[in-house]
C-alpha cells in the first residue's frame, strides 16, 4: 500500500503516468502493441510490426545448414586463436582472411585487420561498466615490471575458432528476416520510432520491446528485477518468441550488452549485429561511487538536474528540437527507483574482451562523435577486438544519434543489412584443370 501511494506521489510530481502492467497473457492491444508475460507477473510491452506472417510455420530455434551445394555467396571462413595469459595479457591472432576489405560505402576504417592483437585485460574492479571512461586503445605495449611479465607469460587458456559462416544480404521482402531493437537505460521502444517506421515501409519485420520498468512494461518494486541477468533473460524470452532463421540485433547503449549476450548464446540464429554507442568490450561492473547509489528519495529530488544533464550529454545540441525529441522518445523517463536499480544491477563479469573476441557474427558499430557518455576510443577498441567489425562515425551525432540523425542512421543500417561479403579464398573450390587440347 505504501509503495502504491509513493508511486502515486511521484507520478503527480513528475507529471508522467506510472508504468502500466499488462495482462498476464500475451495480448494484442488496439494500438498495435503486444503485452508479453515473460514470467509470472513480469510483463513487457512489445512493438511487433511488419508483413503478415507466412502460412508455413517458422523454423525451430536450432542450427540450420540449408545452403545449396556449390553456392558460395557470402561464405566466410572464421579463424582465430585467443590466448589468455596468467599475467593478464590477451593475444588475439587472426589466422584467416576476415572480409574487412569489403567495407561499406563511406565506411570509416581501413583494410585488413592486424594479424595479431595484444592487449591488457581490463580489471573489472576498476571499471564502471559501459558508461565508464575508456581504458586505453588496447596496444600491445604494457608498462611497468616488463621482465616479471615476460617470466610469467604462460597461457592460462587458449580458444580456437575455426568455422564457416554464410553472411547474406537481408532484404525486406524476405520472410525469414527479423530486426530486433533493444534500447538502453531510461529509454523505451519510442526512441526507435524513426527506424521502426523506416524498416516497416521497406517490408522488414521488426520487434522492439520495452525493458522492465521502462515505457509501458511492468515495473517490479524489487531491485533484483533489474540486474543484467534478469533483463537478459527477458530479452531471451522475447527473442525465442519472435526469432526466425536470420535475425538482426540492433542495440543502443546498455542495450548493446543484451545484443552481445544473445549473439553469443545463439550464434546460428543471429545473422548480424548493430551496436550504437555501446562502448568498449569490457565486463560490466557497477561503480560504488556513482551518483546513482544515492537513496531513491535523493535521486528523485535531483531528477530535474539529471534530466538536464542527460540532455547536455546525450545530444549534440540543446535546443527546442532536442527537448521535444527527448520528450517524444520517452528517453530518461523512468522512476528514481528503477534508475537506481538499473545502474547498480549492471554486473556482468562474463562479458569481457575474451567473450567479445569469440563472436563470429558481423557487427556494425555506429558512434556519434559528440557523445559524452561513451568516448570514441571505446568503440574503436570494440572494433579491434571483434572478428568482423565495421566502425562508422557520425560527426553531427551524439549519444542519442538515432533521434538526432535518423536519416543517416537509417541509411547506415540499411546498407549493412544489404551487405554481403565476397567468399573467402579458402572457401572457394579448387579450379578444375583445363581439358587437354586435341592434337591434329
UniProtKB/Swiss-Prot annotation:
Instruction: Enumerate the active-site residues.
Output: 253, 371, 399
**What Pfam families does the record tag this protein with?**
Abhydrolase_1 (PF00561)
Record keywords? Cytoplasm, Hydrolase, Inflammatory response
In this chain, composition skew of type Low complexity spans 124-134
GO cellular component terms, alphabetically, are:
cytoplasm; mitochondrion
Locate the AB hydrolase-1 domain: which residues?
Answer: 178-280
Q: Where is the composition biased (Gly residues)?
A: 135-146
Function noted in UniProt: Negatively regulates NLRP3-driven inflammation. Promotes NLRP3 degradation through the chaperone-mediated autophagy (CMA) pathway, hence attenuating inflammasome activation and IL1B secretion. Acts by recruiting palmitoyltransferase ZDHHC12 to NLRP3, facilitating NLRP3 palmitoylation and subsequent degradation.
Q: Name the PANTHER family for this protein.
A: PROTEIN ABHD8, RE40534P-RELATED
Tell me what this protein is called.
Protein ABHD8
UniProt organism field? Macaca fascicularis (Crab-eating macaque)
Q: What is the lineage of its organism?
A: Eukaryota, Metazoa, Chordata, Craniata, Vertebrata
UniProt lists the gene as ABHD8
